[in-house]
Amino acid sequence: MLDRMASGVTQLFPLWAVIVGILSLYEPSYFLWYGKDAIGVGLGIIMLGMGMTLEFTDFWRVWKEPKLIGMGVVSQFLIMPAWGAFLAWSMSLPSEMAVGLILVASCPGGTASNVVVFLAKANVALSVSLTMASTLLAIFLTPWLTNLYAGHYLAIDGWALLKSILLIVLFPVFLGLLWKRVFEKSARLVSRVSPLISVLFILLIVGYVLAAKRDIILGYWSTLLTAVIFLHFGGFFLGYIVGVLFKRDQSECRTFAIEVGMQNSGLGMALASRHFSHLPMVQTPCALSAVVHCLIGSLLAFWWNHKK
């Protein structure tokens, strides 16, 4: 019963993201109670839950198919940051908005991608492996890529970003792995509802950031929305093309598209709120990204499911 309820709510995540996005802009008071300081805590809990769903042996899966995993991870960190930087330059985005767009483009694949891959009837095992690999590599690549592409807009403290990611990502994931090893029964129980908990915290983070930055979003909505839509649409398209060029099967092509096109927007929001709190516009592309990539991903999943 619990598993079925958690699974049902989790699979409707794209719908909840859109609803929360609309509600947070229409009635900000519904989400403003969450608070900026809770963003990092929420993401840490999500990563802890992710760690509890993994085994140390799962990491060997990456080495069993290095070419496939390598293709996905290289595409993730090569395509999205460069594409985000190109959009920021070509659209002449304000400096703060440009940094926010590049920051979220430099983040790893998000756990929501695993849900969308499942809905699209693509390769879920590959999706989980890619998310895990890109999340671990992001500890070093996200700060470096953000500094590389956005450093000329604003001063970026790459070391501070690195320390935050270690605290928010690596430590909770490793703690979750240890917990599962030592307290297997309790970890198994928690892992049954961890996808549901992850969805709830992501929705709270998205709702809070959109509500807190409502005036900025409404003031720049056309520019913001255009930039974020192009970012993710390009990611989905180019990710799919990578699979086609390397002659992968349809299931793997769809998985690459979703993994490249969907980012860990929660990590982007956590880093933006921690390191650019004095620059409110930096957080807005990250928050809007969570809604946009879920919407595009779910529409693609629906289309692929009904494609003959």
Locate each region found by the language model.
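Alpha-helical transmembrane segments of multi-pass small-molecule/ion transporters
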Residues: M1-K308
